[in-house]
Curated annotation (Swiss-Prot):
Provenance organism: Schizosaccharomyces pombe (strain 972 / ATCC 24843)
Role noted for this protein: First step of mRNA capping. Converts the 5'-triphosphate end of a nascent mRNA chain into a diphosphate end.
Domain of life where this protein originates: Eukaryota
Molecular function per GO: ATP hydrolysis activity; mRNA 5'-triphosphate monophosphatase activity; polynucleotide 5'-phosphatase activity; RNA polymerase II C-terminal domain binding
SUPFAM superfamilies (UniProt xref): CYTH-like phosphatases
Keywords per UniProt: Hydrolase, mRNA capping, mRNA processing, Nucleus
A biological process term (GO) from this entry: 7-methylguanosine mRNA capping
Taxonomic lineage: Eukaryota, Fungi, Dikarya, Ascomycota, Taphrinomycotina
Catalytic activity: a 5'-end triphospho-ribonucleoside in mRNA + H2O = a 5'-end diphospho-ribonucleoside in mRNA + phosphate + H(+)
Protein name, UniProt field: mRNA-capping enzyme subunit beta
GN (gene name): pct1
Main location: nucleus
Family per similarity comment: Belongs to the fungal TPase family.
Length: 303
């Protein structure tokens, strides 16, 4: 017997076993990859049409804006939302409706309501601090930054020649008395949103701010209003916190605290509304959703 040959064959056994193990490992790896592929999570579609569905609230507000931007266009339009309280004219208390979430009121119901856009000084201060923190956070890398401005101005209101309800407003810079604007502001339409889960309701207003000539030098203002305003701008949506002091005898106090959110680029909004009229609604819906999301963040923050 050739021992050398036997020893040679015996020494080959480990390498043969190693090859078998390696081959088994490769097969096992193939099976695992197949199994991973077979149990992959399927893609989730938005719905059975795989199309985005616009919330009713966004659609109603978009239609409301489109009417005054395109159908019956207001030339010098201002569109803003204010936080406040819907008051029942019969009870003089906040309205109570049998609904559980944010609800748009039919404009025909507006005659039964009054909207008070005032809030307490502590609520105003809290929202100021909240927005200041949001401003700081937006300056971090990867964010779209806020713009910020603090202004103080005086508004002088003058009666018109026809003594109409719409007055001429002259706005001046408090520091140097420079005239910033002279307009006749006319309220065109309101849309009220009742928000039972939060401290504030919402009023969306359409106004016409028509530039006019300065009142004559001997005409005295019927009302003077001082404005201390902190303004923030993010993605062309303006957020203003304003403290006003006025001599209007209608209110019990001369000091009021308000928060408003306003579309900063009306030309762009009008273009989006025209596209919506022509059948391409998505750009307008996205802008309205952005606007309302900003309003909702502020409305819910102190509730």
């Amino acid at each position: 017997m050739d021992l050398k040959g036997l020893l040679h064959e015996e020494n080959e056994l480990p390498s043969i076993e190693k090859r078998k193990i390696d081959e088994n490992a490769v097969e096992h790896d193939k099976v695992e990859r197949k199994r991973t592929k077979s149990v992959a999570v399927p893609k989730i579609e938005m719905n059975f049409l795989n199309k985005p569905i616009v919330p009713d609230t966004t659609k109603v507000i978009s239609n409301f804006l489109t009417h005054y931007l395109i159908t019956e266009p207001v030339e010098h339009v201002e569109i803003e939302a204010k936080l406040g309280t819907l008051i029942d004219l019969e009870t003089q208390n906040r309205f109570e409706f049998p609904v559980m979430n944010e609800t748009i009121l039919n404009p025909e119901f507006n005659l039964r309501t009054r909207f008070e856009s005032d809030m307490t000084a502590s609520e105003h201060k809290y929202l100021n601090e909240f927005l200041n923190q949001a401003f700081r956070d937006s300056q971090k890398p990867g964010r779209l930054p806020f713009a910020y401005k603090h202004t103080k101005q005086v508004d002088l209101f003058y009666e018109t020649e026809d003594n109409s309800r719409d007055k001429i407003r002259v706005s001046k810079n408090q520091s140097d008395n420079q005239v910033l604007a002279c307009v006749k502001k006319r309220r065109v339409a309101d849309l009220f949103l009742y928000c039972p889960n939060d401290a504030f309701d919402i009023r969306i207003s359409i106004s016409d701010e028509l530039p006019v000539s300065m009142p004559s030098g001997n005409q005295q203002p019927s009302l003077t209003r001082l404005k201390d305003r902190v303004g923030y701008v993010h993605q062309e949506i303006k957020i203003d916190l304003t403290k006003t002091t006025q001599n209007d005898p209608v209110y019990d106090t001369t000091e009021r605290h308000e928060l408003e959110v306003e579309f900063g680029n009306i030309a762009d909004l009008r273009d989006r509304a025209q596209k919506a009229k022509d059948g391409m609604e998505a750009p307008l819906f996205r802008r309205v959703q952005l606007f309302m999301d900003n309003v909702r963040i502020l409305r819910r923050e102190h509730s």
